[in-house]
């Protein structure tokens, strides 16, 4: 039986809408942050396409979940069109899996080839150098990234990874779900290792930026800005004190006596501080008269509402991740299997919400996208506050309409890796939903009763099917796992090191989240010009060459 058209329409039409929204979102984000005075069309287009591809890898996940959920009825029976195993494979192993492969391959191509080339291509810009010479120079520096990608692909293709048992009787009951899913070619294993390496880097970026941004974002909205008028009065008083100190120092040397080195140094410090305070005072005066300050006053109630909402979402995510990590610590298969969780035992709030939301299509799709956008927005909040750093050395600043093309490409790579690692994070955030959606299976139940008709007691046994929630303990004949879950579980089985790193990385993410929460609570409020005042410090070029 062929797949009904309404199934394909309900699964792929929302995905098409998301594709359009992702293009608009990527274009707006890149254009909002780039410095228009120094931008190049090539770097702008590269950033937009790169961010779009990263968003697509995550946007495909709810389509994957919808298709496997729609294969079954609520009572756990297969629908007529999905009762045939070949039809199910045509959807999951052909259409969905191929789309995943294409998107992941494009993402790796951009990370290792296109973006490094465009970065060095911009660095080679000079009036005396032709475009061909710039391209040759950029290609020379980009070869190193291509070598790293090639090595990872070769290792993934030919390294002796963990193999499944040859004898069916040797299969552990906990791994029965993988019995039919471990058949993969060398090409898929090579791509998995390459993506796993990128995902691991993305996890480190999430721990550094996203965990902090999830607390910094809501508290910045809840606290708001200091009063520009009050801050200006404080700056004016500081200027008066500094001017008085400078006058007293100069008065000591009115007779032409040589100024001591101590007083000369102190006077120089006062003059520098006077210049900075004068600049700040002018900006505070302009802020009081500007339309932005007036709009912020009008929007203040909405800021507090959104701040409270974002804080609740952050706490809900924290609780869900903590419960899943605790569940894995108690009931997982251990580090040798990447801490895979056969059946979630502890109630996970986000998992419960997403499973029940799938009843009203496409409510779960909308909630899923909101969670993804919240992670992206929180990541950007962390990147803006921390800056782009390497080994704690600040390389670039990310500022609206003032971000250099090099920083923009760096930011795109960071967001791509964050979104890529978000697929693994979502697997911990809502494990049941990401693996099986709302699928049930029919479990045979035997009921024995005692019947007495003629004074003789007889045992009467009846059997019927009971709908139970799908779990890893069931084979693919009873439940169909999403492709994203198959990829992750298969990869964790073959290379347990990555699964263990993701598990302990999630714990570290929670620790950084709590640290950022405490810091955001005790941190003082900023003024409306603090971001602009910070942008007047050393330029990005000076930071890189320092």
UniProtKB/Swiss-Prot annotation:
Localization per Swiss-Prot or TrEMBL: Lysosome membrane
A Pfam family matched in the record: LMBR1
InterPro entries in the record: LMBD1_LysCbl_Transport, LMBR1-like_membr_prot
Glycan attachment points: 167, 444, 452, 459
Main location, first listed in the record: membrane
The keyword Transmembrane is assigned to this record: yes
Molecular functions (GO terms): cobalamin binding
Gene Ontology biological process terms, A to Z: protein localization to vacuole
Keyword annotations from UniProtKB, A to Z: Cobalamin, Cobalt, Glycoprotein, Lysosome, Membrane, Transmembrane, Transmembrane helix, Transport
Gene Ontology CC annotations of this record: lysosomal membrane; vacuolar membrane
Topology in the lipid bilayer: Multi-pass membrane protein
Transmembrane segments: 8-28, 48-68, 102-122, 141-161, 189-209, 304-324, 352-372, 407-427, 495-515
KW Transmembrane (keyword) present: yes
Function: Probable lysosomal cobalamin transporter. Required to export cobalamin from lysosomes allowing its conversion to cofactors.
Sequence similarity: Belongs to the LIMR family. LMBRD1 subfamily.
Name of the protein in its database record: Probable lysosomal cobalamin transporter
Species of origin: Nematostella vectensis (Starlet sea anemone)
């Amino acid at each position: 039986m062929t797949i009904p058209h309404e199934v394909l329409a309900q699964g792929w039409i929302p995905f098409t809408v998301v594709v359009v929204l992702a293009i608009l979102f990527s274009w707006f984000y890149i254009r909002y942050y780039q410095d228009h005075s120094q931008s190049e069309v090539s770097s702008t287009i590269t950033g937009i396409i790169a961010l779009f591809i990263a968003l697509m890898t995550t946007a495909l996940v709810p389509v994957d979940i919808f298709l496997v959920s729609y294969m079954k009825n609520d009572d756990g029976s297969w629908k007529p069109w999905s009762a045939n195993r070949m039809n199910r494979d045509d959807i999951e192993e052909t259409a969905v899996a191929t789309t995943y492969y294409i998107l992941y391959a494009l993402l790796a191509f951009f990370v290792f080839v296109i973006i490094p080339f465009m970065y060095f291509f911009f660095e080679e810009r000079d009036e005396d150098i032709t475009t061909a010479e710039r391209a040759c120079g950029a290609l020379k520096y980009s070869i190193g990234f291509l070598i790293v990608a090639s090595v990872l692909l070769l290792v993934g293709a030919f390294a002796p990874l963990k193999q499944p048992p040859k004898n069916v009787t040797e299969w552990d009951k906990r791994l029965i779900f993988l019995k039919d899913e471990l058949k993969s070619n060398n090409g898929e294993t090579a791509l998995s290792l390459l993506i796993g390496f990128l995902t691991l880097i993305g996890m480190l970026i999430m721990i550094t930026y996203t965990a902090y941004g999830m607390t910094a974002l809501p508290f910045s909205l809840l606290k708001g800005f200091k009063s520009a008028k009050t801050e200006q009065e404080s700056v004016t008083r500081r200027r008066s004190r500094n001017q008085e100190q400078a006058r007293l120092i100069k008065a000591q040397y009115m007779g032409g006596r040589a100024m001591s080195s101590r007083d000369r140094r102190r006077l120089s410090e006062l003059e520098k501080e006077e210049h900075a305070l004068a600049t700040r005072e002018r900006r505070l005066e302009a802020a009081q008269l500007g339309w932005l300050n007036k709009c912020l006053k009008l929007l203040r109630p909405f800021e507090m509402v959104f701040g409270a909402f974002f804080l609740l979402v952050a706490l809900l995510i924290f609780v869900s991740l903590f419960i899943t990590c605790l569940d894995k610590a108690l009931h997982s298969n251990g580090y040798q299997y990447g801490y895979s969780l056969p059946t979630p035992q502890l109630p996970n709030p986000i998992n419960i919400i997403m499973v029940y939301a799938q009843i009203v299509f496409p409510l779960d799709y909308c909630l899923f996208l909101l969670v993804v956008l919240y992670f992206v927005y929180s990541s950007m909040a962390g990147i803006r506050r921390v800056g782009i750093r390497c080994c704690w050395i600040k390389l670039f600043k990310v500022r609206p309409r003032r971000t250099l093309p090099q920083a923009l490409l760096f930011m795109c790579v960071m967001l791509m890796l964050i979104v890529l690692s978000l697929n693994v994070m979502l697997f911990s955030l809502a494990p049941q939903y990401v693996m099986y959606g709302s699928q049930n299976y029919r479990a045979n139940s035997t009921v024995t009763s005692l019947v007495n008709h003629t004074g003789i007691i007889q045992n009467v046994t009846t059997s019927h099917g009971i709908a139970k929630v799908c779990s890893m303990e069931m084979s693919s004949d009873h439940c169909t796992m999403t492709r994203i879950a198959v990829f992750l579980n298969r990869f964790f089985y073959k290379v347990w090191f990555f699964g263990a790193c993701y598990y302990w990385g999630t714990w570290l993410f929670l620790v950084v989240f709590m640290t950022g929460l405490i810091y955001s609570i005790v941190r003082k409020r900023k003024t409306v010009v603090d971001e602009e005042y910070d942008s007047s410090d050393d330029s990005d070029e000076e930071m890189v060459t320092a």
